[in-house]
């Protein structure tokens, strides 16, 4: 065992197996330790891949070498290496061999033969050891013949015992001597025949207890020798292999005519009886079909790996098996079943009141069709399938009730009303509602009774979405109230609004978008009452006092934002606190449609903040803070630094990636921006991105006018885009506007002119300049 592995490999293997050195060679314990370590070192169990690979390599080498050692070692030590020469006294005395001749007493070795020859001489002095030859000392014969011998011929008691047809080789051992080339044994034709009572010898592959050869008897015996099996006999006087260390004598087999004739007749009788017992089967003339007829393809389910259940099935097998299945299919409680013949086969069509899997039906039928072919499929169209299988070329044999009818498969149509999703989507699109929760709130409110609705009776301006759509959507809202997919319906409607808005941005020019926004504002102004009209005119008067020549300034700003020329499109509002910057920016966002962004946040959160600008006409960077303030009371911030890092966004020359949460990035031109900030110092790189800069100053009379007229603040007239739209139509002629809305502009101007004359508007303007309530001594607003 010390030669199986090198010393380093042996120590490494024992280390991996976690075994002490004294257990080297204990194959059982080593194998058990290998299994335990394999579970610990396997990569799938959390072990090391390298250690597992090393253990497998060493263990495989160890097993291979041990196997080769067992196969190759005999009386000569390792295969291909001559045994050491011992002293003559030791070799002749029959004592133990040298310490390096492993397994020297193994079966068939020279020491094994010597010991047993000495043993037999003690009991039988007449025993003669077989002669030794040069060939017999090379390799032991380990073949053991286990077939029973043929009965001896009683008429020839003096026949010479037959010997083996040569020495058998161990298939696992490579023979070093090529001169030994025994013929392979022939395969026996006949079955085993019983050994006669007179045969006392037997066995093979070594020395027998009686001292005879493998087919012979003891020398002093009186029994006649047995004939060798026919597949060991060789024709003529062909010389066979000689004796070896196992006790086989050199000789040759000679054929016996009687044995040959007896074996030939015995072989023929066995072959004849075997032929009569199992005659060859004829090939089936009509092979089993591979699928259902093509005329039934459209009515069957062709799913193979499906767990879906069905109430109707069609079984295809032989006629006899289908008849048997027709009688035993009651396990599934069929409501209807019929037996059909088709060519050489049959079909069973049945319907059940409960649904079953196809595999369950097929497994049940396969118990009765172990040999016959069987096919089973579910029927998706029972009535149509029944009409086909009961017509030619099919032949209806029997059925448990007179046919199937169409009325058995159709129920009276039940009128089930569902929520009209399209109607909800149209409602959201008409009112520009992109909030799913707001849409759901409106529709749940529409489920109330229209006659008793308080919101509809008041018809307030801020509730016009409700009282304009309540009666129209009341019936659909009742169905929506009991619907389980309310959130899904509202989310789809909101997505439709966003999709329509994005499509409009792609297809329309910015001038067309501005025209549409102005038209919506004019329509809202047209619906105002007299008191509300004066309130909006007060807001127009307040804005005209905010900046010098404010109508022209507003017109330039709208033109700048609409044309959207790269590097000539951004506007900066800079001034002290409470100077009107945020109010004007909010009104622009309301008029044009946009979002307000906060870029004073850290840079890692800026990406999602900028993503809000998707599909917007304009954005507002509100209250941007810088690092260097002209007013020492201002707090520093990161807004200006972030603006400096957004040059591609501010320029509008290239598309930038905008991303929102739970959605993919979208590449588009960043919209123009209106930036409001206090008195901070801007770097030159940021200053160059603004084409128009408006410096605001604090005007106490404007602040006092707002404080004295709380309705301007409560109704957010200053922050409304409708106020700026009214300012445009109040100060410009209709020719300035698009021809499509010139008629609406003239109509709204005439409406407001009828409510407020020019002299009355001048009084409102004077009140604002004096810091009084704009509507003082003009009207009482409540």
Swiss-Prot record:
EC number, UniProt record: 5.6.2.4
Role this protein plays: Isoform large T antigen is a key early protein essential for both driving viral replication and inducing cellular transformation. Plays a role in viral genome replication by driving entry of quiescent cells into the cell cycle and by autoregulating the synthesis of viral early mRNA. Displays highly oncogenic activities by corrupting the host cellular checkpoint mechanisms that guard cell division and the transcription, replication, and repair of DNA. Participates in the modulation of cellular gene expression preceeding viral DNA replication.
UniProt motif Nuclear localization signal: location: 279-286
Cellular compartments per GO CC: host cell nucleus
Name of the protein: Large T antigen
Annotated Basic and acidic residues bias: 85-97
Residue positions, PTM Phosphothreonine: 278
Molecular function via GO: ATP binding; ATP hydrolysis activity; DNA replication origin binding; helicase activity; zinc ion binding
Biased composition (Gly residues): 199-209
Enzyme class: isomerase
Domain-level remarks: The J domain is essential for multiple viral activities, including virion assembly, viral DNA replication, transformation and transcriptional activation. The LXCXE motif specifically binds to host pRB, RBL1, and RBL2.
GO BP term, pick one: DNA replication
Keyword Transferase: no
Comp. bias (Low complexity): 148-161, 233-247, 264-274
N-acetylmethionine found at: 1
Ranges of residues in domain SF3 helicase: 549-709
Entries under Pfam families matching the protein: Polyoma_lg_T_C, T_Ag_DNA_bind
Binding site for Zn(2+): 453, 456, 466, 470
Gene3D superfamilies hit by this protein: 3.40.1310.20, DnaJ domain, Large T antigen, SV40, domain 3, P-loop containing nucleotide triphosphate hydrolases, Zinc finger, large T-antigen D1 domain
Keyword S-adenosyl-L-methionine attached: no
Domain of life the protein comes from: Viruses
Posttranslational mods: Phosphorylated on both serine and threonine residues. Small t antigen inhibits the dephosphorylation by the AC form of PP2A. O-Glycosylated near the C-terminal region.
Positions of region (Disordered): 74-97, 145-291
The species this protein was found in: Murine polyomavirus (strain A3) (MPyV)
Motif (LXCXE motif): 142-146
Keywords: Acetylation, ATP-binding, DNA replication, DNA-binding, Early protein, G1/S host cell cycle checkpoint dysregulation by virus, Helicase, Host nucleus, Host-virus interaction, Hydrolase, Inhibition of host innate immune response by virus, Inhibition of host interferon signaling pathway by virus, Inhibition of host JAK1 by virus, Interferon antiviral system evasion, Isomerase, Magnesium, Metal-binding, Modulation of host cell cycle by virus, Nucleotide-binding, Oncogene, Phosphoprotein, Viral immunoevasion, Zinc, Zinc-finger
């Amino acid at each position: 065992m010390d030669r199986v592995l090198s010393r380093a490999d042996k120590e490494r293997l024992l280390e991996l197996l976690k075994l002490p050195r004294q257990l080297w060679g204990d194959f059982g314990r080593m194998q058990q330790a290998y299994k335990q370590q394999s579970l610990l070192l396997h990569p799938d169990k959390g072990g090391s891949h390298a250690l597992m690979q090393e253990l497998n390599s060493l263990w495989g080498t160890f097993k291979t070498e041990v196997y080769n050692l067992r196969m190759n070692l005999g009386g000569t030590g390792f295969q291909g290496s001559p045994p050491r020469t011992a002293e003559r006294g030791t070799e002749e005395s029959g004592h133990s061999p040298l310490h390096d001749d492993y397994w020297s007493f193994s079966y068939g070795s020279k020491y094994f033969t010597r010991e047993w020859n000495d043993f037999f001489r003690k009991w039988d002095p007449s025993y003669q050891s077989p002669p030794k030859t040069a060939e017999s000392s090379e390799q032991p014969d380990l073949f053991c013949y286990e077939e029973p011998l043929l009965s001896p011929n009683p008429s020839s008691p003096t026949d010479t015992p037959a010997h083996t047809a040569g020495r058998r080789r161990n298939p696992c051992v490579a023979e070093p001597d090529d001169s030994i080339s025994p013929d392979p044994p022939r395969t026996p034709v006949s079955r085993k025949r019983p050994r006669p009572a007179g045969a006392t010898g037997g066995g093979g592959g070594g020395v027998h207890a009686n001292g005879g050869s493998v087919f012979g008897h003891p020398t002093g015996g009186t029994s006649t020798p047995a004939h060798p099996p026919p597949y060991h006999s060789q024709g003529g006087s062909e010389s066979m292999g000689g004796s070896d260390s196992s006790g086989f004598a050199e000789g040759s087999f000679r054929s016996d005519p009687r044995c040959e004739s007896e074996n030939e007749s015995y072989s023929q009788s066995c072959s004849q009886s075997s032929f009569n017992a199992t005659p060859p089967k004829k090939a089936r003339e009509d092979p089993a079909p591979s699928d259902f007829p093509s005329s039934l393809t459209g009515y069957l389910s062709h799913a193979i790996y499906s767990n879906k259940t069905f109430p109707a099935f069609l079984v295809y097998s032989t006629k006899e098996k289908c008849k048997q299945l027709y009688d035993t299919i009651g396990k599934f409680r069929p409501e209807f079943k019929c037996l059909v013949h088709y060519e050489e086969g049959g079909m069973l069509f049945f319907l059940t009141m409960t649904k079953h899997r196809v595999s369950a039906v097929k497994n049940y039928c396969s118990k009765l069709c172990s040999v016959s072919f069987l096919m089973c499929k579910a029927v998706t169209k029972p009535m149509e399938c029944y009409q086909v299988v009961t017509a030619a070329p099919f032949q209806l044999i029997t059925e448990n009730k007179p046919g199937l009818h169409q009325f058995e498969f159709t129920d009276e149509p039940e009128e089930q009303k569902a929520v009209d999703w399209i109607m909800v989507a149209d409602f959201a699109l008409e009112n520009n509602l992109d909030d799913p929760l707001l849409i759901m709130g409106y529709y749940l409110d529409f489920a109330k009774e229209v006659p008793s609705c308080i919101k509809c009776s008041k018809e307030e301006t801020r509730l016009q979405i409700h009282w304009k759509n309540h009666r129209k959507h009341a019936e659909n809202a009742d169905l929506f109230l009991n619907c389980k997919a309310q959130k899904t319906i509202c989310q789809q409607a909101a997505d439709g609004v966003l999709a329509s808005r994005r499509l409009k941005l792609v297809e329309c020019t910015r001038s067309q978008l501005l025209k549409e926004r102005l038209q919506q504002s004019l329509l809202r102004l047209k619906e105002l009452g007299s008191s509300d009209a004066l309130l909006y005119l007060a807001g127009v008067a307040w804005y005209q006092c905010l900046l010098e020549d404010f109508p022209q300034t507003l017109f330039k700003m709208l033109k700048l934002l609409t044309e959207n020329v790269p590097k000539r499109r951004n506007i900066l509002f800079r001034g002290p606190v409470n100077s009107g910057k945020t109010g004007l920016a909010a009104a622009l966002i309301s008029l044009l449609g946009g979002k307000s962004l906060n870029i004073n946040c850290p840079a890692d959160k800026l990406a999602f903040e900028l993503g809000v600008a998707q599909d917007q006409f304009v954005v507002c960077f509100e209250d941007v803070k810088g690092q260097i303030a002209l007013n020492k009371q201002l707090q520093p911030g990161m807004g200006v630094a972030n603006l400096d890092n957004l040059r591609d966004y501010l320029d509008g020359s290239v598309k930038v990636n905008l991303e929102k949460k739970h959605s993919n990035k979208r590449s588009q031109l960043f919209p123009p921006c209106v930036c409001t900030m206090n008195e901070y110092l801007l770097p030159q790189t940021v200053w160059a991105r603004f084409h128009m800069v408006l410096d605001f100053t604090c005007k106490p009379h404007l602040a006092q006018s707002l404080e004295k007229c709380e309705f301007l603040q409560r109704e957010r007239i200053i922050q409304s885009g409708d106020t700026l739209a009214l300012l445009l139509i109040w100060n410009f002629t209709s020719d300035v506007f698009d021809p499509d809305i010139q008629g609406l502009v003239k109509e709204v101007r005439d409406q407001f002119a009828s409510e407020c004359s020019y002299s009355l508007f001048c009084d409102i303007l004077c009140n604002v300049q004096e810091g009084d309530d704009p509507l003082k001594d003009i009207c009482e607003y409540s």
